[in-house]
């Protein structure tokens, strides 16, 4: 019995020593082959000339400089562009493949397939409340309507800037605007806004707080009204609350990755004159109205000039989050 155990142990020991010897031999052979191969390459290298397909960059200097055979990174190769258009555009064009056609045309301007998104809206006023501006660059096409000239100017102000808003309870409280960035924004099917400024004793200045007919009317039957009153003065408000909502808003700053293109109209709507618009960068443009195909062709042709007036937003952002917070 003990003899069998000794024999088994001896067998394992011999196998282990044999395996160790074989592995050492294999390592020596591989070393010999590798070293010989490297030696041959070293000898033949000066005699062989081959094309270098790599990029030869100097060790020193700015990596932003353009070198021969290097690849430049363009804005549109790493960015997304959203083009927002009214529903009537698709209705007039009446072509199921019109977006594919435009995508191919955008490629000629350096925007690859998949980087341009076409987004339809039904009503510009509703769109301005919840614009969903997710792309790095966002271009909004807004057709001019002479009957809504002031509304369009205010809609552009909403789209091109970020706002922080809170509901107003005008039945219980007086309100005042703290500075030029503080506005009251009213929206609805019909907004009539009346105000009564108050003195330090909460008595009306030129009006009676108990009689709304003596209030000063500053907006009449408008769908959108951005109200600006004298800063630092309490006001009692009267608003047609059945058809309108009013909110106390603060302009946080420009959405620099958004541009508005006015389609048609004799004059371009200019909101840069507003002292709260800073920096004074023009991101409001106009295209002569003919047909929607002509409008889109013009946008494609000048897309890179339009983008140059904007700043890329590096992260996706639900812009509506800046509008109404309770």
Swiss-Prot record:
Ca(2+) 2 binds at residues 177, 228-229, 231, 301. Disulfide bonds join 82-135, 165-249, 191-244, 196-207. Residues 165-167 are annotated as: CNP motif. Its main location: virion. GO terms for cellular component: host cell endoplasmic reticulum lumen; T=13 icosahedral viral capsid; viral outer capsid. Coiled coil: none annotated. Residues 1-50 form the signal peptide. The keyword Signal applies. Glycans are attached at residues 69, 238. Ca(2+) 1 binds at residues 95, 206, 214, 216. N-glycosylated. Keywords: Calcium, Capsid protein, Disulfide bond, Glycoprotein, Host endoplasmic reticulum, Host-virus interaction, Metal-binding, Outer capsid protein, Signal, T=13 icosahedral capsid protein, Virion. It comes from the Viruses. It holds the Pfam family VP7. GO terms for molecular function: metal ion binding. Residues 253-255 are annotated as: GPR motif. It is found in: Virion; Host endoplasmic reticulum lumen. Some rotavirus strains are neuraminidase-sensitive and require sialic acid to attach to the cell surface. Some rotavirus strains are integrin-dependent. Some rotavirus strains depend on ganglioside for their entry into the host cell. Hsp70 also seems to be involved in the entry of some strains. Belongs to the rotavirus VP7 family. Homotrimer; disulfide-linked. 2 Ca(2+) ions bound at each subunit interface in the trimer hold the trimer together. Interacts with the intermediate capsid protein VP6. Interacts with the outer capsid protein VP5*. Calcium-binding protein that interacts with rotavirus cell receptors once the initial attachment by VP4 has been achieved. Rotavirus attachment and entry into the host cell probably involves multiple sequential contacts between the outer capsid proteins VP4 and VP7, and the cell receptors. Following entry into the host cell, low intracellular or intravesicular Ca(2+) concentration probably causes the calcium-stabilized VP7 trimers to dissociate from the virion. This step is probably necessary for the membrane-disrupting entry step and the release of VP4, which is locked onto the virion by VP7. This is Outer capsid glycoprotein VP7.
């Amino acid at each position: 019995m003990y003899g069998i155990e000794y024999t088994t142990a001896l067998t394992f020991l011999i196998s282990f020593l044999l395996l160790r010897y074989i592995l050492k031999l294999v390592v020596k052979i591989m070393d010999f082959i590798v070293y010989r191969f490297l030696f041959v390459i070293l000898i033949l290298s000066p005699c062989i000339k081959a094309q270098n397909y790599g990029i030869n960059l100097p060790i020193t200097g700015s990596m932003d400089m353009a070198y021969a055979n290097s690849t430049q990174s363009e804005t549109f190769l790493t960015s997304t562009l959203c083009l927002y258009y009214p529903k009537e555009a698709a209705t007039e064009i009446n072509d199921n493949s019109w977006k594919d056609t435009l995508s191919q045309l955008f490629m000629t301007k350096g925007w690859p397939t998949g980087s341009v998104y076409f987004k339809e809206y039904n009503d510009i006023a509703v769109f301005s409340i919840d614009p969903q501006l997710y792309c790095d660059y966002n271009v909004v096409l807004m057709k001019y309507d002479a009957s809504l000239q002031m509304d369009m100017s205010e809609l552009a102000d909403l789209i091109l800037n970020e706002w922080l808003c809170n509901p107003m309870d005008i039945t219980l409280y007086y309100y005042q605007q703290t500075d030029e960035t503080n506005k009251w924004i009213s929206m609805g099917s019909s907004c009539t806004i009346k105000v009564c400024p108050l003195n330090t004793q909460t008595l009306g200045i030129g009006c009676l707080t108990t009689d709304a007919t003596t209030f000063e009317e500053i907006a009449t039957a408008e769908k959108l009204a951005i109200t600006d009153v004298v800063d630092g003065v309490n006001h009692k408000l009267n608003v047609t609350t059945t058809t309108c909502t009013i909110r106390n808003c603060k302009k946080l700053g420009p959405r620099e990755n958004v541009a508005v293109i006015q389609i048609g109209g004799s004059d371009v709507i200019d909101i840069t004159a507003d002292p709260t618009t800073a920096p004074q960068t023009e991101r409001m443009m106009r295209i002569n109205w003919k047909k929607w195909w002509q409008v889109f062709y013009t946008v494609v042709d000048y897309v890179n000039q339009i983008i140059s007036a904007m700043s890329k937003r590096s992260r996706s952002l639900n812009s509506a989050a800046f509008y109404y917070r309770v």
